[in-house]
Amino acid sequence: MKTAFVFPGLNGLLRQKDRERYLELPHVIKRLQQAEGALLRDLGMKTDLMGMVKTNTDEIYRIDNISLAAVVISSIQVGVVDHLREHFPNPDWMVGVSLGDIARTVSSGAYDFEVAVVSHVKFTHKIDGIDKLGGNIGVATTLQKPFTNDDFEWFEAQGVDVSVLTSRFLNVGALFSSLENVREKAKDRGWRIMPIIDYPAHSRYIKPYVDASREEFMNVKTMVPQVPIFSTLSCKMLVEPEEIKEEFLETIIRTIHFEKAITTLHKEHGVTRFINIGPCKSLYTLLRDIPLEFQVTDAEDLLASTK
């Protein structure tokens, strides 16, 4: 049985029970402390990441906190993988979605954890102002009313960038005016709208901000992964360090293709078990929505079996 670890993105801390799920795990505590130490040493930032997680959702996702929220999620994810590795074999593949690419790459051995933490915070501070442009929302429909070609043509005409996570769940990044049009369209089509983050991730509109940081980011040391990485951006295996770094940046400004990536792993690479690393259950739900015969497991269940 071939297995893939799957790492969710920035929505990992939206719900209180997700935030609290792994906080008592020793490996998670260690990674949070390690991240705090790296930020203090390299950036002079004194942080209390554990304390931050225990505040409310609005505080955690405040735009000036968003880089630390990302650090917390990545620390939790890497800590969970640390624990799983003490009890189970390595997976055959590592798969990240958006921010999940950080923990994916660290866990694959291609990126040092402390370098990842510091680089992300430095990069995020250099794209200050992107929250003034637009936002990122989830758009869900039902099995009975799937998205149509006309819908996708309408999205394109509105200038929004659509990531197809599954056939009935989209991630939409756009300017504020276009997002308002999507919300109005949703009322007519019976779609459900979920706010995700307050800047237009996975869209063309933040390319100038990303390009301004590209040269410095491309100097970050990256290694050949020890566990294969599969990209939800290009839907292929990533091997070369330069390609891994380039995709980190491209994922921010281009659409991602979760269902296509999972389908390719299953059909072409024989993956029959996908393990959601968490801390949230969003990818667990999306995986179960894909009409293929594979096993979906949550890391929480595996951790429970090790106690």
Task: Please describe what each predicted stretch is.
Residues G9, A35, Q77, G100, ...:
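Conserved small-residue
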Residues L14-Q16, I73-N90, M94, E250-K307:
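Flexible, low-complexity segments
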Residues R19-P26, D82, G109-S119, D289-F294:
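A glycine- and small-aliphatic-rich helix-loop capping segment at beta-alpha/alpha-beta transitions
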